[in-house]
């Protein structure tokens, strides 16, 4: 039996490359985002280095989305073309044996040659976590925004979020110089709920503008503490008043929760538990 974890020896090369998809988790604390960039550590580059070592040739990894510096992922999706004879379902184990501890491959699967992690996706879902207890928690700190300065009313935040559902021009929550040609977003779900000392804001859309969720949360906190009425929040983005959106919530509270596909190539257990406790077991109840 071939031991595919022993990748120091060159694997047999196949004539026809196969396309392999991955479900990836990472803690974004020590990364300058997903995308490869000179002189900075990125998730894409860390995985590509291992893939290239195993494949004995340069390998490019294509992600479903580009998370920013400090943003986490519970289920990023990416694909690459493999020429070695390693079965697609074994790539998760092969990679996990070599990757640093802040990256984990949840699953790997064979996909069609024209399948694309980004362009085949129909939606992405992000969650932002706010920790509201006045007492600091070391284990919670890397994964949430510790906000205890004033009480937050999650029902007011939900009232503000509901009108966002639908296709809208959200230029008010779009950072400048992003390179995107338009700011239309089809928001499929937007919800805010409390779990003990944690407030979670989840948004699902066909795509996201650069910095969109963090800018949204930054002003939704004003709604939650009663400084901005929900209807004024709606007027702000309807009238594209970008100059009034001045603060982005810290990156560490944001997590790419899941990427949706019409026909998912992954088994159900590839997706991590999407309940609020999935990132902080025993700490969020």
Descriptions of predicted regions:
Residues 5-6, 15-285:
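Structured-RNA-binding interfaces characteristic of tRNA pseudouridine synthases
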Residues 11-12:
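Cationic, low-complexity basic patches in intrinsically disordered or flexible, solvent-exposed regions
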């Amino acid at each position: 039996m071939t031991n595919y974890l022993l990748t120091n020896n060159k694997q047999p090369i196949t004539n026809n490359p196969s396309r392999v998809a991955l479900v990836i988790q990472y803690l974004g604390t020590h990364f300058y985002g997903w995308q490869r960039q000179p002189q900075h550590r990125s998730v894409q580059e860390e995985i590509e280095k291992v893939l290239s070592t195993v494949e004995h040739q340069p390998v490019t990894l294509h992600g479903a989305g580009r998370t920013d510096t400090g943003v986490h992922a519970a289920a990023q999706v990416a694909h690459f073309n493999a020429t070695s004879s390693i079965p697609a379902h074994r790539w998760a184990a092969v990679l996990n044996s070599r990757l640093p501890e802040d990256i984990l491959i949840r699953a790997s699967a064979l996909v069609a040659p024209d399948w694309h992690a980004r362009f085949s996706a129909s939606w992405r879902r992000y969650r932002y976590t706010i920790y509201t207890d006045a007492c600091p928690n070391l284990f919670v700190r890397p994964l949430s925004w510790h906000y205890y300065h004033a009480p937050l009313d999650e029902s007011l935040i939900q009232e503000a979020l509901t009108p966002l559902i639908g296709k809208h021009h959200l230029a008010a929550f779009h950072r400048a110089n992003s390179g995107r040609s338009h700011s239309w977003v089809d928001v499929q779900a937007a919800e805010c709920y409390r779990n003990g000392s944690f407030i979670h804001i989840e948004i699902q859309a066909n795509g996201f503008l650069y910095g969109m969720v963090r800018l949204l949360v930054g002003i939704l906190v004003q709604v939650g503490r009663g400084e901005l009425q929900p209807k004024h929040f709606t007027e702000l983005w309807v009238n594209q008043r970008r100059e009034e959106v001045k603060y982005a919530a810290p990156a560490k509270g944001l997590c790419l929760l899941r990427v949706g596909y019409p026909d998912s190539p992954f088994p159900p257990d590839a997706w991590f538990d999407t309940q609020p406790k999935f990132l902080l077991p025993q700490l969020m109840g």
